[in-house]
Amino acid sequence: MPNMEPTTKEIKEQKIYQEMGLTDSEYELVCSILGREPNYTETGLFSVMWSEHCSYKNSKPVLRKFPTEGKQVLQGPGEGAGIVDIGDGLGVAFKVESHNHPSYVEPYQGAATGVGGIIRDVFSMGARPIAMLNSLRFGELDTPHAKYLVSEVVAGIAGYGNSIGIPTVGGEIQFDPCYTKNPLVNAMCVGLIEAKDIQKGQAKGIGNPVMYVGAKTGRDGIHGATFASVEFSEEGEQQRSAVQVGDPFMEKLLLEACLDVIRDHSDILVGIQDMGAAGLVSSSSEMASKAGAGLELIMDDVPQRELNMTPYEMLLSESQERMLLCVKKGHVEEIQALFERYGLEAVVIGQVTDDKMYKIIHHGEVVANVPVDALAEDAPVYHKPSKEPARYQAFQEEKAFVPAMDDVVGVWKELLAQPTIASKRHIYEQYDYQVRTDTAVVPGSDAAIVRVRGTEKAIAMTTDCNSRYLYLDPEVGGAIAVAEAARNIVCSGGKPLAITDGLNFGNPEKPEIFWEIEKAADGISAACLELDTPVISGNVSLYNETDGTGIYPTPVIGMVGLVEDLAHITTQDFKNSGDVIFLIGETKAEYSGSELQKLQQGKISGRAPELDLATEKKYQQLLLTAIQEGLVASSHDLAEGGFGVALAEATFKAGLGADVEVPFALNQLFSESQSRFLVSVKPENEAAFAQLMELEKVYRLGVVTEDDTIRVKHKEDQVTAKTTELRSIWEGAIPCLLK
């Protein structure tokens, strides 16, 4: 028999609503909206829909700062994913989503279902997913638990992505102590769509049926959205019931069936949405609210895989591989027949109404009846207090860190062995990045590139964020995250189009944390405006704290760019001996927040590196022009580890060397100054490249050599290192640490 649910009186007097995630004032607001005390099911509906994860009640004032419009934008924020125009009637849909809390509790399933959820967001728009990326954060690889988390998260991503047949083509991983108990797992999906096929998540047309398709509903993931909206604790590790279990083979069937409906039955499909966070209640109430309609759902008709499920459990379950469709009256059988061909259930569970109410019926009784807008649109919005942390001013005034560089080659080797810098081949080789056979640039270069079939175009894509810079200065660091993403796209031959942002922060109820969120948004907005990359989708993950210890501010930037001609595709590795090496951009003694500072001081402090957005834009445009004119053989942005690491990485693939003279002192070899690019050009293109770059801070450094030796000179100083030795250290670091 099902458990007896608390009465309205018990909910109020025992403050059961607090356990469900509502504050006292929010509970009172619900009572005011309803004109009565909510029952248990209704309290559950409000608790999940008013969670930060679903309502963005703490972050909405900040999100409004983002530029979201541009001539390239076909769909901005507010739907399952954003979409940009790439010409020829085609669009690219993409979005990033976090699955942080679940991935700490149950790393394999947490990561796997994060992948599944973001794939559904993209195909719910009518787009065929063509690529996956991820952005991961872990603690140092010096404990068995850290190694376990990395191995299981990567296995979960691989297990789901490989099984469903979507290539995982790129991403980034950073290791820092602040992520030890707060790992971040952000998954990004990119899809291709014909502009005419764009769908909306809406339920309109009075009397139109609402259909449930896909897997049956179980008790997994109940209150998952609430779980993701509170600070974590050691006890929270026991909350495995809030973590869903995924089935990629079911998802593959669901994907193909939904795309068939969109392609062949668009005239009878009114709307479609994934059942993601907060499950059925979220998808159904949002679809009705967006259309200005109401909804009546019959819980008895919801496919269930467990006995005696209550309406509360069915509405809040986050069981995976489920979609909600609204179709025109009289066409249910057509839709059911299509889904049956894929072996999937498609069941009518309700209909659109005209009263703007959200009515739930079970065993012939009304068990919930609330205004639909109150759930989906009218959550309270909080303008949290904001306060500059004491550390910020201290960092501004701190004496600049000066690295110990007595043994330059020794430092070089140490840096290449740091897991944040070291080769991630051991990780990405677990992913099938060639499935679908359209991957033009595989993991390991600045950006991944996937061809657009039937055209000469390709899509460049990347995820980026150096959270250490944001810890020092969230505004500058936020701008750098966008700039670096754009750099990676440009270095690969693409024109940056737009971003999706995964905003991972600590507890917003702490004024110092909310200050970080505000400032990071300011930096991201400024860079997006300057570089013409509007924010078209995203995700907010707050409360990434465990027992009071939080993460660095980590707004992950997922960016997509257009490679207009396959001939423009460029990679970071040197191609031929004799090619001429150039450095674009100025190198300064900037080590704060750098991999070198972390290595030598064991901590991060000081002023973040400077970023001039006008200079950044100018250099990116010049480099992209040079690439499009066929003048560039290789191109690599300078990021973690600065020039020294970028130069070494450029030699590794072909086993070449380099003989260069740099315009800065050798103790600045690992400075992380911004807006810099390492470029090689064929000798016959040198004059044209130099002319294009005339009057800019562009330096001819030397040439690519046939031997496996890197020689770096500045005036009388010189260092020499063997490519093979550096590569061995770089490639072996992570496999060694994960043993």
Swiss-Prot record:
Xref: CDD domains: PurL_repeat1, PurL_repeat2
Residues binding ATP, per UniProt: Y56, K95, D501, G538
Record Pfam families: AIRS (PF00586), AIRS_C (PF02769), FGAR-AT_linker (PF18072)
InterPro entries: PRibForGlyAmidine_synth_PurL, PurL_linker, PurM-like_C_dom, PurM-like_C_sf, PurM-like_N, PurM-like_N_sf
Key words of the record: ATP-binding, Cytoplasm, Ligase, Magnesium, Metal-binding, Nucleotide-binding, Purine biosynthesis
A GO BP entry: 'de novo' IMP biosynthetic process
Top-rank taxon, per record: Bacteria
Catalysis performed (reactions): N(2)-formyl-N(1)-(5-phospho-beta-D-ribosyl)glycinamide + L-glutamine + ATP + H2O = 2-formamido-N(1)-(5-O-phospho-beta-D-ribosyl)acetamidine + L-glutamate + ADP + phosphate + H(+)
Pathway: Purine metabolism; IMP biosynthesis via de novo pathway; 5-amino-1-(5-phospho-D-ribosyl)imidazole from N(2)-formyl-N(1)-(5-phospho-D-ribosyl)glycinamide: step 1/2
Enzyme active site: H53, H99 (proton acceptor)
Binding site for Mg(2+) 2: D121, D274
Cellular component annotations (GO), alphabetically ordered: cytoplasm
Coiled-coil residue spans: none
Gene Ontology molecular function, alphabetical: ATP binding; magnesium ion binding; phosphoribosylformylglycinamidine synthase activity
Annotated residues for binding of Mg(2+) 1: E97, N539
UniProt keyword Iron, yes or no: no
Residues the entry annotates as binding substrate: S98, H99, N100, H101, R120, Q244, E318, S319, Q320, S541
Intracellular or extracellular location(s): Cytoplasm
EC class name: ligase
EC number(s) recorded for this UniProt protein: 6.3.5.3
Assigned protein family: Belongs to the FGAMS family.
PANTHER family registered for this protein in UniProt: PHOSPHORIBOSYLFORMYLGLYCINAMIDINE SYNTHASE SUBUNIT PURL
Subunit structure: Monomer. Part of the FGAM synthase complex composed of 1 PurL, 1 PurQ and 2 PurS subunits.
Record-linked NCBIfam families: FGAM_synth_II, PRK01213.1
Role according to the record: Part of the phosphoribosylformylglycinamidine synthase complex involved in the purines biosynthetic pathway. Catalyzes the ATP-dependent conversion of formylglycinamide ribonucleotide (FGAR) and glutamine to yield formylglycinamidine ribonucleotide (FGAM) and glutamate. The FGAM synthase complex is composed of three subunits. PurQ produces an ammonia molecule by converting glutamine to glutamate. PurL transfers the ammonia molecule to FGAR to form FGAM in an ATP-dependent manner.
Annotated protein name in UniProt: Phosphoribosylformylglycinamidine synthase subunit PurL
Organism from which the protein derives: Listeria monocytogenes serotype 4a (strain HCC23)
Name of the gene this protein is made from: purL
